[in-house]
């Protein structure tokens, strides 16, 4: 938790590892990952990145970060990112890690 003059800043991160069963090449995987990251960035205004498994055509580790003045709002935004991924993409979420920075 970081204190800034005039208010409180909360930074929360969500790191998920996904398995993309329908991917048969790095090109397939990157298409799916790029779509997930772009949609979450545009829809929920979060910072996003692919963090690991860059050269694996089936797995990817994705990171999402939001900055706000409300812990509940940060959790809500990250939950929406996770729900979007689970409901609109043919991927299996292998692990989920949340962190307050």
Regions found by a protein language model. Give the residues of each.
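N-terminal amphipathic/basic-hydrophobic helices that include classical n-h-c signal peptides
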Residues: 1-8
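Short, charge-patterned binding micro-sites
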Residues: 11-12, 49-70, 99
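Short glycine-/aliphatic-rich beta-strand segments at the starts of folded cytosolic domains
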Residues: 12-22
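C-terminal binding/interaction regions
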Residues: 29
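A short linear hydrophobic-aromatic micro-motif
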Residues: 46-52, 92-95
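C-terminal structural segments of small proteins and small subunits
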Residues: 66-101
